[in-house]
Swiss-Prot record:
InterPro entries: Paramyx_V_Zn-bd (IPR024279). One of its GO terms (molecular function) is metal ion binding. Coiled coil: none annotated. Zn(2+) 1 binds at residues 170, 189, 214, 217. This is Non-structural protein V. Residues 55-65 have a biased composition (Polar residues). The gene is P/V/I. Signal peptide: none annotated.
Length: 224
């Protein structure tokens, strides 16, 4: 079988291709009409038959985000996730985490090792990673041989921090923040009857048994 195309066959192929191109260029474009068998001249370009369609993707505009409509709408609908957790209550801890009067919390800075100085475009990411590891290790006790190792969880504490404690109590919580090239840790106390949320929040007592202050948060309010 001859694999080379003759000169007269080349001319026929070029002419056929031009005819196909002119056919589609001259045809009007109507909305979302796509390529189908009915729009192709039989015997002209059989290879085009069966090609996948190119669907028109409609993106929602900002004016439609968050609105509710009856029926089925066209286009993709965005998934809107609220930045705050609904139903958890409490007061959100401000960002960046600075100590503020009357809120009952302290801010400490996790200083970096001067011998470790990452460079390049990922410098901030590397410094934040180092600071996070040091902050976590700061509040995690070393494994004991007599007791099983438990996973670190924000809000974990001593026996008085158990939610089932009838006398009430406080639990210590921590939040990590990256502020102006430094890793800062904000510490505060919440009543044990309040939920442990992913977002850093101040909560008030709901059961009536939790004290206003405990031995953990007395230093948060400064000298009396």
């Amino acid at each position: 079988m001859d694999q080379f195309i003759k000169q007269d066959e080349t001319g026929d192929l070029i002419e056929t291709g031009m005819n196909v191109a002119n056919h589609f260029l001259s045809a009007p474009i109507q909305g979302t009409n796509s390529l189908s068998k009915a729009t192709i001249i039989p015997g002209v370009a059989p290879v085009l038959i069966g090609n996948p369609e190119q669907k028109n993707i409609q993106y929602p505009t900002t004016s439609h985000q968050g609105s509710k409509s009856k029926g089925r709408g066209s286009g993709a609908r965005p998934i809107i996730v609220s930045s705050s957790e609904g139903g958890t209550g409490g007061t959100q801890v401000p960002e960046p985490l600075f100590a503020q009067t009357g809120q009952g919390g302290i801010v400490t800075t996790v200083y970096q090792d001067p011998t470790i100085q990452p460079t390049g475009s990922y410098r901030s990411v590397e410094l934040a990673k180092i600071g996070k590891e040091r902050m976590i290790n700061r509040f995690v006790e070393k494994p004991r041989t007599s007791t099983p190792v438990t996973e670190f969880k924000r809000g974990a504490g001593s026996g008085c921090s158990r939610p089932d404690n009838p006398r009430g109590g406080h639990r210590r919580e921590w939040s990590l923040s990256w502020v102006q090239g430094e890793v800062r840790v904000f510490e505060w106390c919440n009543p044990i009857c309040s939920p442990i949320t992913a977002a850093a929040r101040f909560h008030s007592c709901k059961c009536g048994n939790c004290p206003a202050k405990c031995d953990q948060c007395e230093r948060d309010y400064g000298p009396p």
